[in-house]
């Protein structure tokens, strides 16, 4: 997986044995399928090159990525991610449809 694979999306980065990551993924699955077509979930251990490309150290981290794979916004921490995720996905959906 490369930065172009996650272009124009929100990308949730998680890692194993991370309780906030688990809670955040459960939240994501609860809103499926309404907005998750605009979201990719990436497991840190499975995609080290992508994690390195975005210089990630804390999890969960939600990135909003433009059509070129460039980071537009970074939100760190499960509670912060859950509070802002639906609004971010709605914004991406709106921008794709205009």
Where are these regions (language model features)?
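Structural micro-motif
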Residues: 54-64
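Non-catalytic, surface beta->alpha helical segment in thiol-disulfide oxidoreductase systems
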Residues: 65-98
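Chalcogenol-based redox active-site neighborhoods
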Residues: 26, 53-54
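Short beta->alpha connector loops
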Residues: 43-46, 60, 79
């Amino acid at each position: 997986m490369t930065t172009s694979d996650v272009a124009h999306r929100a990308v949730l980065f998680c890692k194993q044995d991370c309780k906030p990551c688990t809670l955040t993924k459960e939240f994501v699955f609860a809103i499926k399928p309404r907005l998750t077509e605009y979201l990719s979930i990436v497991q840190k251990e499975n995609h080290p090159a992508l994690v390195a490309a975005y210089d990630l150290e804390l999890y969960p981290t939600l990135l909003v990525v433009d059509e070129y794979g460039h980071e537009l916004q970074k939100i760190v921490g499960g509670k912060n991610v859950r509070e802002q995720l639906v609004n971010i996905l709605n914004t991406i959906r709106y921008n794709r449809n205009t």
